[in-house]
Amino acid sequence: MVSQIRRPDDTVPLVGSVALNYNCGGVDDHGVRAGLSGWKRDVTAADVDRDRFVVWMPTMCCEAHLRCYNRRDISTAWGVKAEYTRFYAEGTGYQLDRADAAKVAALDRALDLIHQYDLILATGHLDRNETLLVVERAYAKGIRRIILTHPLFQSTELTPETMHRMWTQYGAYSELCFSNLAMDHLTYDQYMAVIEAVGAPGVLLSSDVGQIFSPTVGDSLREFFGEFQKRGIKEDDIVQMSVLNPNRLLFEAMS
């Protein structure tokens, strides 16, 4: 946990996160409160962590995610043995429907805390309609730090036009990850279409590596940025998408 390993003399800021999967309490305020508490046992009595962190909507327990991986939370193609993955029966993954009052109320409890403490919201592996609903409700509550989690990923599959609308209407950044190219068979042509539609101010470039077969963060980003430069993306735009935009989301004042 970042709150437990962070040191006063750190020269590089460490930023934590929590994903609201079932094993963290699901989509409600429980996981957010745990993150705010610094992961202390009694989250109601703990002091609130002063540092901003990322709150992801569900990822590997989403019904949309499970449909992509034969009902397993983790794909064996990622280098994980099947016995270390979890199988979810049809329909048991997380789903969000605006007609489900209980689930929407639980979502709102999580969003209220994210807004109250000015945290960063990432949309996780929700499907297209679920993603749009979360962004819509988050923005209405005043949340301004919003990331569309690798929105070309097969569980979500937003179009570049939709990403453009999410940026202009809600200020939601579209994330393009190096790892999705190999793992999920996405292409640089698809990434270029997103950059063209949204513009560098509304895009985040990240590695999302850490798998046993992936390059290091440094090597992956070096390759990633080099491929964009070969395709005509200016260095200033790469800096915008990989440094300035994340810095704004994490550390700068936003209104």
In which residue ranges do the predicted regions lie?
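An N-terminally biased module of ancient metal coordination in phosphate/nucleic-acid-related enzymes
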Residues: M1-V12
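Short acidic/histidine-rich active-site segments
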Residues: A200-V217
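Mid-to-C-terminal alpha-helical segments outside catalytic/metal-binding sites
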Residues: S220-S255
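Divalent metal-coordination and catalytic microenvironments
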Residues: L14, V55, T59, L121, ...
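Catalytic pocket-lining loop regions of alpha/beta-barrel enzymes
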Residues: D112, Y117-T187, L204
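Histidine/acidic-residue-rich catalytic or RNA/ligand-binding cores of hydrolases
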Residues: M1, L132-E136, E157-M163, D184-I195, ...
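Extended substrate/RNA-proximal surfaces in nucleic-acid metabolism proteins
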Residues: D10-V12, G25-L148
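Active-site beta-loop-alpha junctions enriched in small/polar residues
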Residues: S17-N23, P58-C62, L126, P151-Q154, ...
